[in-house]
């Protein structure tokens, strides 16, 4: 079965909704054909965002590049359809299909979902619904595709675990081809789904939820751990990490001149130069996920830059791309080819080093995180006040049009003084910018803190800052009373040249925290509520998720006698976490020690200054001697075959860590 594209185009046009980005959506769905042979093993990569948002995501390109080289495997793609297309699908009972092949998703062998952000869960539910596929893995027999989830959302998988047959944990370049080859071979041999999933469960990084079940405390109704339902299942699932310095990973992502099918996944200007980070902010989950810090070899970076010569622009990508040891060489190489270099948010302490790039920008973005030095010590953000102000003044003085500063509110150990300091920071930013360059634009972006699994703050309670309402009120008063207004001579009127941007509604962030800490009981009520209120992540995340929160809360109370507010409480050291089955490499004892150090406002030095014995190096021997995390020291040798660091307490930067 293939969808008749001409007929469907006509149907879509008849359902055009005002404000819908229909042209982009139709371009993604119909401009290119992906040809599959009848005998091909068919895989569709599903991205839980609209086409115009997701087509440039690097993870999309990496996995597509890996799969496109497997013989006898046909790779298609699908995105969340635009609202007009969704209306047409529903009204005409047409199942959602692969954009390239026009084959309904339910007829593929494997559907691979990219799960990167908590709000994407809403879109994922709708995609499965429009594909006319049963939601729960236990409802899908032999005739249905195998559903696989990939992406960082899988580090806390239990809220969506009942939906998927397989959840891949970590970096996929090495193991994703193994997974597909295994399924392809066994399906060709006529093996049952149960046998296929048992084989996949033994592939590193593969979590097969059906082989485990949650355990609950009968008295408190709280999550109490997990047990295996099949003895052959792994006890833990380890996040997969790849040695990106290996030349075999030197890919340009797509050859957009030759490969028509992948041309729809247009060449992104991003060039990955690093994975991981050495700085150790305690709120940052990617710091734990992507440890240890690794760098791509320079020849691979040059190859990727050159592939973007016709684009005219390139951007180095990584958690902290300016840490790349050959950053300046890569930038100069791009310039020598006539390619304009762009950048992400700047590390304030490296602003001087990258000044040649920054002074040409129209805007810069500084991640300050906290308004005062004590709170920055608590979150382990190694940044003195004078370094920030030096960078801020230099940016304003250089004529950069907009300078954005990002901070958080609702952090552990936060006091009202810390919130007052945010207001003072805003006033000082305004005063300094007026003195240096009166017409410069400044922006203070404030996000609500979220305690993330696998970080030192995973034990923290998720709370709405008791001062959040006051903070927003004072913000509004300052803008309404003219505090931030100047007279623009060109326009001949008063204008606001600094502006507020408070992101992350309390309701939305509360729901994200719940999804991180949720167990499998939450899955069904979540699906029911998303469908009932027709919730998408592109909507007002706060307003929509107030409904979703109430719906899930009511269901859990009625069916399980459990108050979901209890899920967001502060946790003890030995509290069982729903994500305990996932091991990203960092020891629990190390994270607890960091949590205690945060309570005392004590910093721990970054991995580039010394090893704090977090546990990663003992679990990933394939990265032995290739990680800046341990100063490229070979921890695995004849005298220390286990790789466990044998350090005295005074040798550990920042204190002992179990």
List where the protein language model places each region.
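N-terminal pre-triad scaffold of radical SAM enzymes
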Residues: 43-49, 67, 254-285, 448, ...
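A short beta-strand-loop structural module common to alpha/beta enzyme folds
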Residues: 72-84
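A glycine-rich phosphate-binding loop feature that marks nucleotide/adenosyl-phosphate handling sites
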Residues: 199-209, 319-324, 346-351, 441-451, ...
């Amino acid at each position: 079965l293939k969808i008749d594209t001409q007929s469907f185009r006509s149907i879509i046009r008849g359902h055009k909704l005002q404000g819908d980005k229909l042209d982009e959506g139709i371009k993604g769905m119909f401009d290119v054909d992906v040809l599959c042979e009848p005998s091909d093993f068919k895989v569709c990569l599903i991205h839980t965002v609209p086409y115009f948002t997701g087509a440039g995501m690097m993870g999309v390109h990496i996995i597509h590049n890996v799969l496109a080289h497997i013989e006898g495997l046909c790779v298609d793609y699908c995105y969340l359809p635009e609202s007009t297309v969704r209306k047409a699908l529903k009204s005409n009972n047409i199942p959602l299909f692969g954009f390239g092949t026009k084959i309904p998703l339910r007829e593929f062998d494997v559907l691979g979902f990219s799960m990167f952000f908590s709000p994407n869960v809403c879109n994922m539910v709708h995609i499965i619904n429009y594909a006319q596929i049963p939601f729960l893995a236990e409802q899908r027999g032999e005739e249905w595709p195998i559903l696989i989830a990939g992406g960082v959302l899988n580090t806390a998988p239990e809220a969506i675990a009942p939906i998927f047959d397989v959840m891949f944990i970590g970096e996929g370049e090495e193991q994703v081809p193994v997974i597909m080859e295994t399924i392809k071979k066994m399906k060709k041999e006529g093996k049952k789904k149960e046998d296929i999933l048992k084989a996949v469960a033994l592939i590193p990084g593969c979590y097969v939820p059906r082989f485990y079940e949650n355990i609950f405390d009968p008295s408190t109704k709280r999550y109490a751990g997990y047990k295996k339902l099949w003895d052959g299942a792994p006890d833990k699932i380890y996040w997969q990490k790849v040695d990106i310095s290996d030349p075999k990973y030197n890919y340009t992502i797509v050859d957009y001149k030759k490969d028509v099918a992948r041309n729809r996944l247009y060449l992104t200007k991003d060039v990955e130069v690093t994975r991981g980070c050495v700085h150790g902010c305690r709120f940052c989950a990617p710091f734990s996920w992507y440890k240890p810090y690794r760098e791509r070899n320079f020849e691979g970076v040059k190859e990727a830059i050159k592939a973007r010569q016709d684009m005219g622009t390139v951007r180095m990508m990584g958690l902290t791309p300016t840490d790349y040891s050959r950053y300046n060489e890569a930038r100069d190489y791009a310039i020598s080819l006539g390619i304009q270099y762009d950048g992400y948010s700047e590390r304030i302490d490296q602003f001087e080093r990258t000044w040649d790039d920054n002074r040409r920008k129209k805007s810069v973005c500084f991640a300050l995180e906290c308004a005062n030095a004590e709170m920055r010590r608590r979150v382990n953000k190694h940044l003195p006040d004078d370094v920030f102000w030096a960078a801020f003044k230099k940016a304003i003085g250089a004529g950069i049009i907009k300078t954005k500063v990002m901070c958080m509110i609702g952090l552990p150990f936060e006091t009202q003084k810390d919130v007052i300091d945010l207001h003072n920071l805003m006033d000082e930013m305004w005063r300094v910018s007026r003195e240096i360059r009166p017409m410069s634009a400044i922006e203070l972006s404030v996000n609500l803190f979220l305690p993330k699994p696998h970080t030192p703050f995973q034990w923290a309670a998720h709370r709405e800052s008791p001062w959040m309402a006051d903070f927003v009120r004072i913000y509004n008063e300052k803008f309404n009373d003219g505090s931030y207004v100047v007279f623009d001579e060109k326009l001949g009127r008063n204008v606001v040249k600094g502006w507020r941007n408070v992101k992350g509604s309390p309701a939305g962030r509360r729901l994200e925290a719940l999804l991180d800490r949720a167990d499998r009981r939450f899955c069904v009520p979540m699906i029911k509520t998303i469908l009932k209120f027709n919730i998408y992540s592109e909507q007002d995340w706060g307003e929509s998720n107030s409904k979703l929160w109430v719906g899930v809360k009511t269901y859990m109370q009625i069916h399980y006698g459990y108050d979901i507010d209890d899920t967001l409480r502060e946790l003890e050291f030995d509290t069982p976490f729903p994500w305990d089955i996932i091991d990203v490499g960092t020891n629990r004892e190390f994270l607890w020690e960091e949590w205690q150090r945060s309570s005392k406002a004590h910093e721990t030095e970054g991995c580039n200054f010394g090893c704090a014995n977090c546990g990663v190096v003992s679990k990933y021997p394939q990265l032995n001697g290739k990680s800046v995390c341990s100063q490229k020291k070979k921890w695995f040798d004849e005298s220390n075959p286990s790789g466990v660091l044998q350090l005295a307490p005074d040798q550990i930067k920042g204190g002992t860590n179990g």
